[in-house]
Amino acid sequence: MTNAMKVEGYPSMEWPTSLDIPLKASEELVGIDLETDLPDDPTDLKTLLVEENSEKEHWLTIALAYCNHGKTNEGIKLIEMALDVFQNSERASLHTFLTWAHLNLAKGQSLSVETKEHELTQAELNLKDAIGFDPTWIGNMLATVELYYQRGHYDKALETSDLFVKSIHAEDHRSGRQSKPNCLFLLLRAKLLYQKKNYMASLKIFQELLVINPVLQPDPRIGIGLCFWQLKDSKMAIKSWQRALQLNPKNTSASILVLLGEFRESFTNSTNDKTFKEAFTKALSDLNNIFSENQHNPVLLTLLQTYYYFKGDYQTVLDIYHHRILKMSPMIAKIVLSESSFWCGRAHYALGDYRKSFIMFQESLKKNEDNLLAKLGLGQTQIKNNLLEESIITFENLYKTNESLQELNYILGMLYAGKAFDAKTAKNTSAKEQSNLNEKALKYLERYLKLTLATKNQLVISRAYLVISQLYELQNQYKTSLDYLSKALEEMEFIKKEIPLEVLNNLACYHFINGDFIKADDLFKQAKAKVSDKDESVNITLEYNIARTNEKNDCEKSESIYSQVTSLHPAYIAARIRNLYLKFAQSKIEDSDMSTEMNKLLDLNKSDLEIRSFYGWYLKNSKERKNNEKSTTHNKETLVKYNSHDAYALISLANLYVTIARDGKKSRNPKEQEKSKHSYLKAIQLYQKVLQVDPFNIFAAQGLAIIFAESKRLGPALEILRKVRDSLDNEDVQLNLAHCYLEMREYGKAIENYELVLKKFDNEKTRPHILNLLGRAWYARAIKERSVNFYQKALENAKTALDLFVKESSKSKFIHSVKFNIALLHFQIAETLRRSNPKFRTVQQIKDSLEGLKEGLELFRELNDLKEFNMIPKEELEQRIQLGETTMKSALERSLNEQEEFEKEQSAKIDEARKILEENELKEQGWMKQEEEARRLKLEKQAEEYRKLQDEAQKLIQEREAMAISEHNVKDDSDLSDKDNEYDEEKPRQKRKRSTKTKNSGESKRRKAAKKTLSDSDEDDDDVVKKPSHNKGKKSQLSNEFIEDSDEEEAQMSGSEQNKNDDNDENNDNDDNDGLF
């Protein structure tokens, strides 16, 4: 009888289930059933085995049966008794057995460290004895490698394994045997490579094992699956384990691994809650079934920890670890212990015990330093323990190898954002360091957004949008802030989350800053609707914000709100400032009253920098000249007494120095020129001081850009202005950009910027000045490219600017300047047309320029009559008028006559060319018709010829078919001749006769014989009934002997001889009576 593990489709592995022991005194046999008859104490068998002098194999078979039934200690005891019976070399295999038995015991999960070490020591001692008897036996070699493996000496095990395999191959080579791979050595090598984390090499060996021995135990499919799992191919891993379980349903390792795969699939591949519930429920059910049979398996216990954690039973998670897993930790793989410790860390974290959580995460990393989740947990506990710098270091080290991890980018972004927002950190760090913190936070959070959106099936955490918006606000990039805050709003609306009041308020603020007052007002009102009447402070703030948005469109309403707010809360400084500002801006308050109010406000709040800044602005913009000096004094006092870093005071003083520098620059006095340079330097120093305090202060940055531009350093000025535009896209910034482009002679870009200002910022006050600047840009471009059209564009803009000043006083210097420009443009257009080639001008253009010249002369006369006009000397103006009335006018009239004659000539030439072209077209059409007709006739002729050829070919085919039929009939008659028997009798004679003929005379007969043979074979295939022929004297066929002989001779003949004898062969055919025709 045999015990077999049957695997469908493969041969079975079998162990003996019974043993027959012969009795020494008789020929009888004593049978032992190895399944049921094994005694609990192996000494009961010793008497029988010793008295009957049983062979060593009987002892080993019984011991092996004990081991197969889980009684390894009894098997060891039996073999130890056998050592007393056998001596010398017979003990070799016994020691080998004991080695493997002790190695097997050392793998037990419930052993202590001391017990495991004892078993390994016993295995080592027995292995030494076994090697002493037989060092080259493969069983001893494998045991040596296995011993190294269990002690964790993987490098030594690999090295030893390679040496043993080489020695075996060398022995095979010496013996003349073919070396074959040893499955057990391959299995050990695959396991060692896996432990060394060389998963690809390990996978290849496991696959090789599967090919060599598909029923090998342990199943290579489990190793294949483990390698695939480590190589991030979970689908192939699960398939491998499922196949192993299918072949052996009792394989515990395979069933546990399949269960792990089910848990993973339920979390990663569930498309909705329903599928997750079904998959997770099935996994839990399978866990329950497997755990009932393997309650001490550490992997299953760790899975139970996972289940209880998600259930919220954190104490049970900790109990499983401390009371069950920790007891057998020496026998558990480190990766399993690491996972179990990790869940303990999470449980402590959930219970709020962050110190113990930190310890458990550290313990998890000690067991497996690659445990990513444990590293994340460690960093989070550091945050909870207020170790922010340490947590950043932890996460940054983790980021080096996990850049694409969404959660890691989110955490790092939030940590750096927290440092950027922290007021204490801001005070103790420089502006550059603060900017670096901001940039790092944005880098990580924007990468988090990119990674999350790329998945297309995950929602972004709305807080990420909020923080990014806030970070861009610190950089004064309000448009970008608005974009991200709007995305946060969309996200909240999508998940139907109640929108916080703060989000609506901030959105409104960003819309206000970007100039969309209507949208801002609407959002402020939405926010106010969410506030209860009891929350008075929030209500007042929103009322103030609503008033700010209505200042442009409804000043009365804004003033009313400010008055209400200040009456209820007199200490609301911002409302009082805005109220006074509106009154002053609309001239609703007398200067003396305004001065009194401002002084009262300042006296009550002398140290308030907002009020001091407003007071400085008032002094600067009041009509009294004395206030300019007061403004300077006031700003200096602010810097000296109250705050040396006040941005408004510093910028105001810097602006003053710029004004002084400009005035000195106009003077021709060298001292004034030197004073101008010093003033510019002082202004630069003040602007730079502001930027040190606030790196994103756009007013200081624009001041620096203006100084660079006025110093002809246009490149740096342009770069700064572009950055300022990104933060504050207002009219001044765009105009300054246009000025720089104009100075750099990039007229196209300058024109584009001026036109953008006109479209985007519809400011009636500045529109005429911008139109004049736009005309100037077109004029500069026209001079460069010598284009009349560009002069016309410049003229159109200048005229539009002049029309907008109809209501202004005629004494305005700006109007005089524009009129002069218009007159000058008319003269310039006339001069350009006069000098241009007739090909590039028209009669109408010259006529228009004559009219324009008249208009220009009128404007010059008008300006000449004005006493206050002093742009150019009167004498020069009179010379221009005289030049226009005489030389210019007569030159234009001549140009007009020349142009008319030129255009008449051109018109005549065009008409003549058109006629010639039409005639050529008609001729060409005639040629084309002729060619088309010739082509058609040719095609018809070809078609007719083709048809005739087809008819002739058809006739030839029919004739050939008729000839073939007649030839076939003749062949049938010759084959059925009555002379067949006579011909058969003469075969030997003819053969001898023909062999004596010359080669020339036999050549034709060989060819004819070959032809006849073909016809004979055809007849055999047709299988027709032969009829007697009436053609006497002819034979129906040639003999096979003749054909064979003639074939041999034909192969020896040369091609030249064959060609020479063709005619002779034909004559011989007629003479010979051989049946050929």
UniProtKB/Swiss-Prot annotation:
Query: What Gene Ontology terms describe where this protein resides (cellular component)?
Result: Cdc73/Paf1 complex; euchromatin; nucleus
Disordered: where is this region?
A: 959-1077
Which molecular-function annotations from GO does this UniProt entry contain?
RNA polymerase II C-terminal domain phosphoserine binding; RNA polymerase II complex binding; RNA polymerase II-specific DNA-binding transcription factor binding; transcription coregulator activity; triplex DNA binding
Q: Which GO terms describe its biological process?
A: DNA-templated transcription termination; G1/S transition of mitotic cell cycle; mRNA 3'-end processing; negative regulation of mitophagy; positive regulation of transcription elongation by RNA polymerase I; regulation of transcription by RNA polymerase II; regulation of transcription initiation by RNA polymerase II; regulation of transcription-coupled nucleotide-excision repair
Q: Pfam families from the entry?
A: TPR_8
Q: Which SUPFAM superfamilies match?
A: HCP-like, TPR-like
Comp. bias regions, Acidic residues: 1042-1051, 1063-1077
Q: Where is the composition biased (Basic and acidic residues)?
A: 959-980
Q: Which UniProt keywords apply?
A: Activator, DNA-binding, Nucleus, Phosphoprotein, Repeat, TPR repeat, Transcription, Transcription regulation
What does this gene product do? The PAF1 complex is a multifunctional complex. Involved in transcription initiation via genetic interactions with TATA-binding proteins. Involved in elongation. It regulates 3'-end formation of snR47 by modulating the recruitment or stable association of NRD1 and NAB3 with RNA polymerase II. Also has a role in transcription-coupled histone modification. Required for activation of RAD6 ubiquitin conjugate and the BRE1 ubiquitin ligase which ubiquitinate 'Lys-126' histone H2B.
Subunit structure, as described in the record: Component of the PAF1 complex which consists of at least CDC73, CTR9, LEO1, PAF1 and RTF1. Interacts with SPT6. Interacts with FACT subunits POB3 and SPT16.
Other facts noted in the record for this chain: Present with 12900 molecules/cell in log phase SD medium.
Instruction: Supply the name of the protein.
Output: RNA polymerase-associated protein CTR9
According to the entry, what is the taxonomic lineage of the organism? Eukaryota, Fungi, Dikarya, Ascomycota, Saccharomycotina
